[in-house]
Amino acid sequence: MKHAFQSCLLAGLMALGVLSAFAADEVKPFSEAEKRLFLADQLSALPKTVTLNYKFSKTGTLEANFEDMATLKVADAKSGVKGRVTHVNFLTGERKIALPDAGEAVGNPVVMFYLERDIREMHRITNGSENYYRKRIRLTLEDNAVVKPITIHYAGADVAAFEITIDPYKDDPARSRYTRFANKLYSFIVSDHVPGGVYQMHSIMSDPQLPAGSEPMIDELLTLQENAQ
């Protein structure tokens, strides 16, 4: 049964064009981080049709700063089909990221959009392989993610959540190829008590040439807003 479920997951990721990023090379048990980030049922409790809004911000010393938005539109799938129909608008204009819609989504596809954009940005600033960065993130989520319970404040209440943190380039044997951009930490906050299950995604890239606590080179933050429609 587990192997069949994993096969379904791999097929879904392949349909999204991100198989090499987040699917294992061979069947193995999913880590707690993978389960909470990719496999949790994050959409079934939503209304029949709803739009979730996320605020995106980029700050830091390396490049121009900006703010933008992402939206997740969710509707019921056809009768007898498990999951939900989803459409994501991730950022706008020349910054927009396009991936195929999901017709049987169970997990929140905004996670995939965030990671795919991040990987493309790593390629842009380092000229390194997108597939390589995908693999680093995937392996770290499999084997070296830290998952801890936390409390967040959402919609006027304190609610239980989990924070997943990864440092995918810390022990990379090829780190010397992109040393300046390798100090990059990621955190993902997920909760059953917020619409869509994903509250926040955050990455911080620090400059190895500056003292700890200096302003980051890149700080990117995506946060669920409270104005679902």
Regions inferred by a protein language model and the residue ranges of each:
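Bacterial N-terminal signal peptides that target proteins for export
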Residues: 1-9
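General helical structural elements
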Residues: 6, 121, 138-142
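Bacterial N-terminal signal peptides
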Residues: 9-17
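Sec/Tat signal peptide C-region and signal peptidase I cleavage site
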Residues: 19-23
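Acidic, serine/threonine-rich low-complexity disordered tracts
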Residues: 24-101, 127-229
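Surface-exposed, glycine/proline- and aromatic-rich loop segments on solvent-exposed faces
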Residues: 96-121
